[in-house]
UniProtKB/Swiss-Prot annotation:
The conserved cysteine present in the cysteine-switch motif binds the catalytic zinc ion, thus inhibiting the enzyme. The dissociation of the cysteine from the zinc ion upon the activation-peptide release activates the enzyme. GO terms for biological process: cellular response to UV-A; collagen catabolic process; extracellular matrix organization; proteolysis. The keyword Nucleotide-binding does not apply. Ca(2+) 1 binds at D123, E198. Can be activated without removal of the activation peptide. This is Interstitial collagenase. It comes from Oryctolagus cuniculus.
Amino acid sequence: MPGLPLLLLLLWGVGSHGFPAASETQEQDVEMVQKYLENYYNLKDDWRKIPKQRGNGLAVEKLKQMQEFFGLKVTGKPDAETLKMMKQPRCGVPDVAQFVLTPGNPRWEQTHLTYRIENYTPDLSRADVDNAIEKAFQLWSNVTPLTFTKVSKGQADIMISFVRGDHRDNSPFDGPEGQLAHAFQPGLGIGGDVHFDEDDRWTKDFRNYNLYRVAAHELGHSLGLSHSTDIGALMYPNYMFSGDVQLAQDDIDGIQAIYGPSQNPSQPVGPQTPKVCDSKLTFDAITTIRGEIMFFKDRFYMRANPYYSEVELNFISVFWPHLPNGLQAAYEVAHRDEILFFKGNKYWTVQGQNELPGYPKDIHSSFGFPRSVNHIDAAVSEEDTGKTYFFVANKYWRYDEYKRSMDAGYPKMIEYDFPGIGNKVDAVFKKDGFFYFFHGTRQYKFDPKTKRILTLQKANSWFNCRKN
């Protein structure tokens, strides 16, 4: 590839004392970085013709722009996290330079739009494709004055097709993985049209690529939306499947800024993505897992690793597709390398990213809770004793992980053995011999030997935030 050694020097920061032989993998990564920046960040494919110093700076600035968009550490170099992000399947619409057909911010002038499915993927039945597309349109019509009608022939406002490779729109697909689909802004001709890459496998569940999920995203472009930096938004460029497809509040705000709210008497409200450095952040559940700490909120996890300053935020379904959103408790049993998750009167068990078969199971038959207990507020297990503490309202139970039975004499009042933490526990975990209890925005570091609170901090103090 022309200019590849120069780009290797530029991006990997090799000094002027010599140029090491680039591995085949490294050359492939450089080629991928170059194509990614050309496709999604408007790095012109003739950038190497620019004078050296200016061209070098342009490539680095585009890489920094990409890192900033995805909330990565801005280095201007293709580090491991940047390469990982670039390799994720995504929408083919650029992040900073849209498929512009008309100047300004295009929108449909009429509120009654038509769509036509020109052909069907063999991966799904026609009925499944029709249903996925109809549901995707419904998401947007629920929050706007827009209505959508399917037509079977002729030209529609939004034409939908499954194509592969070069399909004569100046935006060829790249085969399996990579670009999944793309769509064009509102306008005449190709404006509003949606193309799905037939080289990808389309499904109606969590496997491969969920057609409903991708269609809902692409139709956002068809209506005039660009990509969002909010990882919880449907308009986030990378493919995410969280089990339930819904518009985040960020999506709703964006589309209503173009078309206004729906005419429904009650306006739909979407979920918001937690901000790790929000001083008002609270948690649904927390657990240790193989030396890391995972915090759960709604449909998201936040992952704190002692060796990294960055906090990873993503959908729970990325790790465990079958777990529900809104988990209420979680704990680690280190000697079995298991994590148990609780919601309502059900629980699930995983080992690493592997979801064990036979779940969910019932907490009453498995642990011996009385029928009056319909959910667990928080749970934590002690590795040295094999004892697990379950917190429910203002009481707690103690369970023996080796005997697989509840200890006698329980429940007890929380305030008796854990004085000062209050009568309600939202989440808890144990680290280095201390319990960390969470209630609302507060976190209590508790010494079980002295039964004293050692420190009181904000709940998100584990996230290296500058201000709390």
